[in-house]
């Protein structure tokens, strides 16, 4: 979070994504998909979330759609305009949440370029109430909810996932017992990302507690430019 607040991390990747053309993004992604396929992966969930502006979020989702059409890998797209409040909206968070819900989502729905909606519910990103607003708007536009929750601080993201019946909650490194209980009741899949914990030197999510509580557990790479360079599910 310190790196992010200093303009690095997600914001740095956002700046690079905005400057890149669709062709440049597709070439970079295609190379990563080739490597994933070499490790035996045949289906990938790909998220937007590094555009953080309508034009660039749609650009990323269009690239995912084109790759699904032309690459051997099967891709499933997730809209994640609520990954971070971008620098230009730091003093007007409410307007950015409105932009995500009232401008981006209708266009995503109209173009049919995403199946899921995700939000990063965490300290210094989106509050529980902001996350609720985003995910409920996603449901309105036919986007099934997912949530990044309890990665650094347990602020209530896993409980929100259970309340909304999200398809999955990601990270969950510091997921509390109340969050596990809520996910079990809501039928939420805990999508754990241990390669990120490994890369950051962080603790691992309480997977055994989740299994014992009846929460279905899945794992993924969390391949991204900032916190996890891993493309290999065999390592995960």
Task: Name each region found by the language model.
Residues 8-30, 34, 42-155:
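Metal-coordinating catalytic core of metallo-dependent amide/deamination hydrolases
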Residues 94-115, 160-178, 214-217:
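Structural recognition of alpha->loop->beta junctions
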Residues 156-157, 178-179, 205-206:
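Short acidic active-site motifs
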């Amino acid at each position: 979070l310190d790196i992010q607040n200093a303009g690095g991390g997600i914001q740095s990747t956002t700046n690079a994504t905005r400057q890149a053309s669709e062709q440049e993004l597709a070439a970079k992604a295609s190379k990563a998909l080739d490597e994933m396929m070499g490790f035996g992966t045949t289906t990938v969930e790909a998220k937007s979330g590094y555009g953080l502006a309508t034009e660039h979020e749609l650009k990323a989702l269009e690239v995912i759609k084109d790759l699904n059409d032309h690459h051997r890998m099967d891709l499933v797209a997730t809209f994640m305009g609520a990954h971070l409040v971008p620098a230009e909206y730091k003093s007007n968070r409410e307007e950015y949440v409105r932009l995500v819900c009232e401008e981006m989502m209708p266009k995503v729905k109209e173009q049919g370029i995403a199946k899921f909606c995700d939000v990063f519910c965490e300290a210094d990103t989106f509050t529980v109430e902001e996350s609720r607003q985003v995910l409920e708007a996603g449901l309105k536009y036919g986007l099934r909810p997912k949530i990044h929750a309890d990665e650094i601080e347990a602020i209530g993201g896993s409980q929100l996932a259970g309340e909304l019946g999200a398809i999955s909650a990601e990270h969950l490194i510091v997921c509390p017992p109340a969050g596990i209980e809520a996910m079990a009741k809501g039928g939420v899949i805990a999508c754990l990302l241990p390669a990120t914990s490994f890369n950051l030197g962080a603790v691992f999510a309480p997977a055994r507690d989740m299994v014992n509580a009846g929460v279905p557990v899945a794992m993924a790479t969390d391949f991204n430019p900032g916190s996890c360079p891993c493309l290999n599910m065999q390592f995960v």
